[in-house]
Curated annotation (Swiss-Prot):
Pfam families associated with the record: Knl1_RWD_C, Spc7
Chief location bin: nucleus
Keyword Secreted: no
The protein, known as: Outer kinetochore KNL1 complex subunit SPC105
GO biological process: homologous chromosome orientation in meiotic metaphase I; kinetochore assembly; mitotic sister chromatid biorientation; mitotic spindle assembly checkpoint signaling; positive regulation of meiosis I spindle assembly checkpoint; protein localization to kinetochore; sister chromatid biorientation
Annotated organism of origin: Saccharomyces cerevisiae (strain ATCC 204508 / S288c) (Baker's yeast)
Length: 917
């Protein structure tokens, strides 16, 4: 059975699914005898297994990622001569016993180091995987696929081993690196070092309060105590264990080189592939590693050129794990946890390799892992130098280094050593000297001495950049001398005299006090900032500047001191510049105040000068008058008594003076009446004053009741304006303006007739308060109609005058329509009688008889004839003719009724009553 027939049979057996290929061609027409005899067609001779279908097809969800590199040149053609086949779906089988999501890893025995990998399957392929275990063990592990999120363990191609790409990644997995030691001597030293680290771990304290960062050791030597159902949160941080003192770390390049030389490379790679692939990734878990399995460390980014530590994690590929495997004894083989990846919010530029003590099973139960990991994401990067040094200071074992490798490891000293014995007489910390490994020159170039934490105070004292500047203090030689210091002077002077003496100096003292307060505030603010900065440095890792300074030689230290002195001088000049700018602004403000005071004093001085000039002029007049009176008195004393003869002018003045005295005597006699009248006026004034006070109190009480806030804001004006326009269009009344108490409106229904309403008198007399403005542009008909409406409004409904007027206008609106229609038939005009009655006059001309008929009807009668169907309509007619023609009343009634019947159907012949004039 060929492939095409098998696909068609599978399509018929399936209820749902496509029966033909995507290209919609006739498949049966191609299966001819010539087609089968074609030597280029390959017909299968055996049943294709499921594994071959999965490996060879690109239409399934199971993708073989391990063979991607070998299948790069594979091309899939979708030409018209190629047929795409449909496949039946394998139904999921319900098993009575559900396989756990995390399967126990098989321990690696020393006799089966290079055992083959077990194929990975999903939950829908468990039965097939069980039947194919033996087949999968005999085949190449590179052909095994990957299901969903299971870890991928791919062995780098031996032909490409020289590329040494430590950053290549298979799919989206991130793998931690492991180191392989091919030297058998290293294994013995590792076992001995693990025993010492076990003793140290018993007294170590965990450095992280939230989620610990743990070490993942050799993947063939992990503890078997891993709980199968352990929850996994996000991604586990996997790093290397800290090896005390000087630790040999081999780079990925040298490890690849050593692995490439090894003979059992393929066996170890397959064994590790099996171990890693059997651990599915179920999102993440926080993993506590066992510190009793130390191993050689390596890192590509532990120390950069600036000497900064690297924090948190390192990204390592699966190639490094294959190339850095460590062989261990069977007693130290452990099960290993699944690889996990983590996505950090902030990627740190530096990372440090750390390890944490082993916790009990209840500590790693996963109760607080979710919250701890979330907080850990926010708080990273975090330094772990205290954890590193607790191990580093208690262990003296040193691992060896392979020849030809480069060491990039580093050790740190923590603040916990301050309390120990490594402190000198001055209280400074002394870095513990470590025993370096005996390696060649090439390996020695990559080893860094341990670092030490330094405080900001120590750095400032060492460099000599203090904050107290004695030069500035010495320059302040200006002193304020107070003469009140003597005891006798204080006793002899009163307070007003002292105040008067120092009145000018008091503002200067106030300015100086304000200046001192500003300096004091600035100094306190600087102190607080310095304390905060010092606290931040104490709590965090020492800055790069401190590490570089204390790790440099004397020449470099002197250069750094000179640079810091230069920076200090520049900062001091900047601070002085800011201070002088502040002083300048203060002095400018004082100058403005003094200028304002000077102008005020000048104005007062000018006023005083004017007053002095007035006083001097009055004084001069008084002096002259005094001298004249004295001269008159002397002259009168010297003259005899009979020698005085008054002149005519003097006599006239005397008579006038006498008349004035007589008038005053009369008013003096009537002083009682004046007194009584004054009393009555005072009483009236007091009464009016009381009335005013009561009225003011009433006004105040009314004001309290009225809400003071604004009813409308400026944002409400556009909305109110639009509302007013809508009301104008609905009612036909337009508001023109509102000035004082006069409201001007225009009626759209009456050809924009303008009416002014005085709201002050509207309540008392509505009719008189409304004034109709008869402009020349408006039609007289609207004016007379509105006047008629005002007269016809009932007097008893004056309270609702405007509403009644509006309803009447709405009711009489058709009257304008009939008048306009009448204008289309006859020339119409409106006249007014002496009684101010509006008359409607229209003209009818008879061409045959050359006679003109003038009909006159009052506006009220015309309105009654329009709106009512009963009653007589009085109409006057005047005949103007050039011939002797005098038609009868019947003829005129028939004529006028015939002409206006189409416009005014209510004007019938029986209702029209003509009167000849």
């Amino acid at each position: 059975m060929n492939v095409d027939e098998r696909s068609r049979i599978g399509g018929r057996e399936k209820d749902a699914g496509p029966g033909k290929g995507i290209l919609k061609q006739n498949q049966s027409s191609q299966m001819t005898s010539s087609f089968l005899e074609n030597p280029g067609v390959r017909i299968p001779t055996r049943i294709i297994t499921k594994k071959e279908v999965l490996d060879g097809s690109n239409t399934t969800s199971r993708i073989n990622t391990s063979n991607l590199q070998s299948m790069v040149k594979r091309r899939v053609s979708f030409a018209p001569d190629v047929t795409l086949h449909s496949f039946t779906f394998v139904p999921e089988q319900n098993n009575e016993i559900k396989e756990p999501r995390r399967r126990k890893t098989s321990t690696n025995s020393p006799t089966k180091i290079s055992s083959q990998e077990e194929p990975l399957v999903t939950s829908t392929q468990i039965d097939d995987a069980r039947t194919e275990e033996k087949t999968a063990a005999e085949e190449d592990p590179d052909t095994s696929g990957m299901e969903l999120t299971e870890p991928i363990v791919a062995t780098p191609d031996s032909n490409k081993a020289s590329q040494h790409d430590p950053t290549s990644m298979e799919m989206t997995e991130v793998f931690p690196r492991s180191i392989r030691q091919k030297n058998p001597d290293v294994e013995g030293e590792s076992i001995e070092s693990s025993q010492q680290i076990d003793d140290v771990e018993a007294v170590r304290e965990e450095t992280m309060e939230l989620t610990a960062i743990h070490n993942v050791h050799d993947y063939d030597s992990i503890s078997k105590d891993t709980v199968e159902g352990e929850p996994i949160d996000l991604t586990e941080y996997e790093s290397k264990p800290y090896v005390p003192n000087s630790v040999s770390r081999s780079t990925g390049k040298s490890s690849d080189y050593s692995v490439e030389r090894s003979n059992d490379k393929s066996d170890l790679s397959k064994s590790e592939n099996k171990t890693n692939s059997s651990q599915p990734m179920e999102i993440t878990d926080i993993f506590h590693a066992d510190p009793q399995n130390p191993m050689s460390l390596h890192s590509d980014n532990n120390i950069n050129n600036d000497g900064n530590e690297m924090e948190l994690t390192q990204i390592q590929t699966n190639f490094d794990r294959d190339n850095h495997h460590i062989d261990e004894s069977p007693s130290e083989k452990h099960a290993f946890s699944s690889n996990k990846r983590r996505k950090l919010d902030t990627v740190s530029d530096y990372a440090a390799s750390v390890t944490t003590p082993v916790k009990e099973a209840k500590d790693t139960s996963g109760e607080d892992n979710d919250g701890d990991l979330e907080m850990m994401e926010k708080m990273s990067p975090i330094t772990f130098s205290d954890v590193d040094n607790k191990i580093g200071t208690r262990s003296n074992d040193v691992f060896t280094i392979e020849p030809g490798t480069e060491d990039t490891g580093m050790q740190t000293a923590t603040d916990d050593e301050e309390d120990g014995e490594n402190v000198d007489d001055n209280g400074n910390k002394i870095v513990e000297k470590t025993r370096l490994p005996e390696i060649d020159k090439e390996g020695q170039s990559g080893i860094a001495l341990p670092t030490q934490d330094y405080t900001l105070r120590e750095f400032i004292n060492e460099v000599g950049v203090g904050f107290l500047d004695t030069k500035l203090i010495d320059d302040l030689d200006k002193k304020v001398n107070f003469p009140l210091n003597s005891f006798n002077f204080v006793e002899n002077q009163r307070i007003d005299n002292v105040f008067s003496a120092f009145y000018i100096d008091i503002p200067i003292l106030e300015v100086e006090a304000f200046r001192c307060k500003e300096l004091w505030r600035s100094i306190n603010e600087s102190k607080d900032k310095f304390k905060d900065f010092e606290a931040q440095i104490d709590k965090s890792h020492p800055p790069l500047l401190l590490q570089e300074y204390f790790s440099s030689d004397e020449k470099m230290k002197q250069l750094m001191r000179d640079q810091l002195q230069l920076v200090k001088g520049y900062s001091k000049l900047e601070a002085a510049m800011e201070w002088y700018e502040w002083r300048k602004k203060q002095l400018n403000g004082l100058e403005l105040i003094l200028a304002e005071n000077l102008n005020t004093l000048k104005r007062e001085y000018e006023k005083l000068n004017e007053e002095v000039e007035k006083v001097n002029s009055i004084r001069g007049k008084i002096r002259k008058l005094n001298e004249a009176i004295k001269e008159e008195i002397r002259s009168l004393k010297n003259l005899p008594s009979d020698s005085y003869k008054p002149t005519l002018m003097n006599r006239i003045k005397i008579e006038a003076f006498k008349q004035e005295l007589m008038e005053h005597s009369i008013s003096l006699s009537s002083s009682n009446d004046f007194t009584q009248e004054m009393r009555s006026l005072k009483l009236a004034i007091a009464k009016k004053s009381n009335d005013i006070l009561t009225l003011r109190s009433e006004v105040a009480s009314i004001d309290k009741k009225i809400e003071k806030r604004k009813l409308f804001t400026r944002f409400d004006l556009p909305k109110l304006r639009d509302t007013l326009k809508i009301l104008e269009s609905l009612t036909g009344v337009r508001f023109l303006k509102f000035s004082k108490a006069t409201l001007s409106i225009a009626f759209l229904q009456l050809d924009d007739l303008r009416v002014d309403i005085n709201l002050a008198n509207f309540k008392n007399n509505p009719l008189s308060s409304m004034k109709v403005m008869n402009d020349s542009n408006n039609d007289d008909m609207s004016y007379h109609l509105f006047t008629m409406l005002l007269k016809n409004v009932e007097a008893e409904h004056q309270d609702s005058m405007l509403s009644n007027l509006f309803f009447a206008m709405k009711k009489w609106r058709p009257l304008l329509k009939y008048i306009k229609l009448l204008k289309l038939l006859f020339p119409v005009k409106i006249t007014q009688t002496e009684e101010e009655e509006a008359l409607l006059q229209f003209k009818d001309y008879d061409r045959r008889n050359k006679t003109a008929f003038f009909y006159v009807i009052s506006l009220v009668s015309f309105a009654q004839g329009v709106f009512s169907e009963n009653g007589q309509i009085p109409m006057k007619v005047h005949i103007s003719t050039q011939q002797d023609y005098s038609p009868s009343r019947e003829v005129l009634s028939d004529r006028i009724t015939h002409k206006i019947s189409g416009v005014l159907p209510s004007f019938t012949k029986s209702r029209i009553h003509l009167e000849f004039t």
